[in-house]
Amino acid sequence: MHYENNWESLNSRHVPDWFADAKFGIFIHWGLYSVPAYTEKGQYAEWYMQQIRDENSAARKFHDRVYAPGTQYEDFVSGFKAELFDADEWAQLFEKSGAKYINLVSKHHDGFCLFKSDYAWNWNSVDVGPHRDFCGELKTALEKTDVKFGVYHSVYEWFHPLYLKDPEEYAVKHLIPMLKELITKYEPWTLFTDCLLYTSDAADDLIGVD
């Protein structure tokens, strides 16, 4: 089915039959925040980078107690080795569970990507840390099963200079190009974009928001 870049055409699309019948999928939060792997009850461990900015938070107290003085979130790159990660093992487990699709967090609000991105130089799992393309590895492994590969992608990044300066400029120069890169490179069956960031200038030409 071909859709035009107007709202009437985009709104005419229907949920794919496979997704309506899928019933069960698996959402995978795994990234740099998995190194400290900490949060207080009722909070999100993947928000660790943000939480330790608050001097009074439980995460900050944990951080100061466990890690050397001056340790920054960015320093966790050296500890993100993923030496036990086996994409085929994951894929087989997902299929055995009965899941019909998965969504891997390709990038969370910390901006760290689990794929090589031209828009996240030196802040992705290929350039630094484990030096592996986890999106690519998992997609390839899942193609040997009946489980469909999908991705989650954070719309905004807490401390990206462009986002802090001008969210619309960030969307046009960083977010949308990275999304196009991700979709073109991996052709995911599902794309889950998280958090509201809407730029009226480019939206009609580039994206559909639902």
Residue ranges and their predicted role:
Residues 198-203:
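Conserved small/polar residues in nucleotide/adenosyl-binding loops
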Residues 70-86, 117-132, 162-172, 192-197:
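The substrate-binding groove and active-site-proximal loops of carbohydrate-active enzymes
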Residues 2-104, 109-111:
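N-terminal structural segment of carbohydrate-active enzymes
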Residues 100, 106-161:
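Acidic/aromatic-lined carbohydrate-recognition and catalytic surfaces
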Residues 93, 141, 168-186:
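An active-site-proximal structural segment forming one wall of the substrate-binding cleft
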Residues 4-7, 11, 149, 183, ...:
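Aromatic-residue-lined binding/catalytic grooves and analogous aromatic/hydrophobic interfacial grooves
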Residues 103-112, 153-161, 176-197:
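Active-site groove signature of glycoside hydrolases
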